[in-house]
Amino acid sequence: MTKASSEDLCQLAHRNDGLACVVLRVARFFVEGDDMPDLYDGRSQDNIKANEYACRRVALEDAVDAHLNAAQRAPQLGFGRYLVSATTPFTRDDLTQLRTDAASVFARRVPLAAAVWTQRGWRFPDRLDRVYVNSRARRDLNWRPRFDLNAVAARLARGQSVHTPLSQLVGSKAYAHSSYHRGVFAPARP
């Protein structure tokens, strides 16, 4: 069963039986190293995670808040699918350039991050193939995420970690000795 088919079953349960179901598609929030680090052209794990706050990451605190708001709003919503991610600094007008020259768009949209990245010797991605937009979740769930790329850049400028307070408290929950941490996950064959 796929995630999409599971979501469809939730929608059927709402339609057929009136069960309130709110589906949250949660962006990356884990502190573990990326499973495909070779794709990032020598960027550090912190650089990768910080960049992702613009397009495909959410702070653990914000993910928790989204779940609490969804549980509270479910009876009024009935059914809904929502993307839970940091608020992107990009607009629809940026999408074409993000495919070919993302670094320029980052520098234009988030100048604080551009300055902090330069100080750290970090780089923005050359191109982005996706940008998660959380506007429906913010509107319908009355959700106000606190951590976006500007907030992360401000934390870094103050000498704080790219990892938010809750993610530091929770830490890594990696599976010890799994092949997942050495590349793309591939189940062992008998």
Which sequence ranges carry the predicted segments?
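Active-site Tyr-X1-5-Lys
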Residues: 1-21
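A short C-terminal helix-loop "cap" of Rossmann-like NAD(P)-dependent dehydrogenase/epimerase domains
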Residues: 16, 29-51, 103-118
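Alpha-helical substrate-binding/gating segment
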Residues: 32, 37-48, 52-83, 87-89
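Aromatic-acidic/polar surface patches that form glycan- and anion
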Residues: 53-60, 126, 130, 145
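Residues in well-ordered alpha-helical elements
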Residues: 61-64, 135, 146, 150
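Mid/C-terminal beta-alpha module of Rossmann-like enzyme folds, strongest
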Residues: 64-129, 134, 139-140, 163-168, ...
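Short linear loop/turn motifs
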Residues: 121-126, 148-159
